[in-house]
Amino acid sequence: MQLQFRSWMLAALTLLVVFLIFADISEIEEEIGNSGGRGTIRSAVNSLHSKSNRAEVVINGSSPPAVADRSNESLKHNIQPASSKWRHNQTLSLRIRKQILKFLDAEKDISVLKGTLKPGDIIHYIFDRDSTMNVSQNLYELLPRTSPLKNKHFQTCAIVGNSGVLLNSGCGQEIDTHSFVIRCNLAPVQEYARDVGLKTDLVTMNPSVIQRAFEDLVNATWREKLLQRLHGLNGSILWIPAFMARGGKERVEWVNALILKHHVNVRTAYPSLRLLHAVRGYWLTNKVHIKRPTTGLLMYTLATRFCNQIYLYGFWPFPLDQNQNPVKYHYYDSLKYGYTSQASPHTMPLEFKALKSLHEQGALKLTVGQCDGAT
C-alpha cells in the first residue's frame, strides 16, 4: 500500500510539473475557447526560428553598418537599403489573416458592444483577476452599438509606432497617403507632422498615458490639453483598453466624463476581454514567445483582418539607429525604457525580429529609415 501511495504521489508531482510548464498556453487556449488551436493552426511565420540567426534584411533606409543593441549583444541587425526590392506577398497575407481568424475576429473583438453589457455589470480585470469593476453609466453610454470596423476594408494601412527613429525620417507625407492610419497612445502629431504625418483614423490610449502625458489631469490646464488632443481626432476611433488592470479605472472614467461633457467628436471603442490573450495565443502558437503583446503588435494583428497591405513606421526597439546614433524611446518625449529588461511586460526586440521576418516574406513592409522622397 505504501509503495502504491508513493507511485500515486510521483505521478501527481509529474503532472503538476507538466501543468506548470504549459500553464501559460493552456490558460490562453481556455480563455479564447479554442481547444484545438495548438494542433490545428499552421504557422504563418514558420520560418521565424529558421531565420533567427540571419543578420541581413531588406528594410527601407540609408546604407548602414550592422546595428547592435548594446543592451543585449546577441541581438544584431544588418539592414540594407533596398525598398524597391520589397514586394507584397498577397498569398501569405491572406494565409495570416485566415489563421488569425481562428483565434480572434478584429471586427468583433475591437470593442465590447452596448448590447452585451449594462450599467452595474461586474467585470474582472484581465491582469488583476481578483479585482473587479462595475460598468459605469458613462462607460455604457460610450460603448458602440455596432463594431466601428463593421464591413470595413482598406487597400493600405499604416501603423505608426512611437519610436524616436521617426525623427528626421520625412515619412509624414507617405503615412498620410494610406487608406487607414493607426496611431498609438495619443502620440502628438502636429509638431512632428513632417516625420509622422497628420492623418489619424484610429488611435489607442492606454490609461497610463493620462498620468504620463497629462499629469493625471490635476488641474484645468492639463484637462484642456487633453481636450485639445481629443478634439483633434475629429471623428477618429479612440481605442481605450479599459478592462486591463485596476489601476487604470479612474483614468478611464476621467476621459469618458470629458468626452461626454464636452461632446468630443470621437468614436470610442473598448477592446473585448479576450482580445489580448487571443493575440498572445496566436503568436505563442507560432513560436514567438512574447510576454504581453505591445500596442503595436496588437494593432498589426487586428489590422490583418481589414487591411490588404500593412505598412509599419516607428517600430525600432533599440537605443541606436542604423548609423549607431542614439534613438529616443518616444519621438515626442524623453522617457527611458529598458528594451531587454526582465521586468518589462513586453519583449520588444523579439517582436521586432518577428515583424522583420514577415517583412522579408512580403507580409508587411517595415520602414526604419528615411522614406522615399524625404529631403
UniProtKB/Swiss-Prot annotation:
Transmembrane regions: 7-23
Glycan-linked positions: 60, 72, 89, 134, 219, 234
Side Lumenal, residues: 24-375
Localization terms from the record: Golgi apparatus membrane; Secreted; Cell membrane
Topological type in the membrane: Single-pass type II membrane protein
Keyword Hydrolase among record annotations: no
Function summary: Catalyzes the transfer of a sialic acid from a CMP-linked sialic acid donor onto a terminal alpha-2,3-, alpha-2,6-, or alpha-2,8-linked sialic acid of an N-linked glycan acceptor through alpha-2,8-linkages. Therefore, participates in polysialic acid synthesis on various sialylated N-acetyllactosaminyl oligosaccharides (alpha-2,3-, alpha-2,6-, or alpha-2,8-linked sialic acid), including NCAM1, NCAM1 N-glycans, FETUB N-glycans, and to a lesser extent sialylparagloboside (SPG) and AHSG, which does not require the initial addition of an alpha 2,8-sialic acid.
The protein's name: Alpha-2,8-sialyltransferase 8B
Name of encoding gene: St8sia2
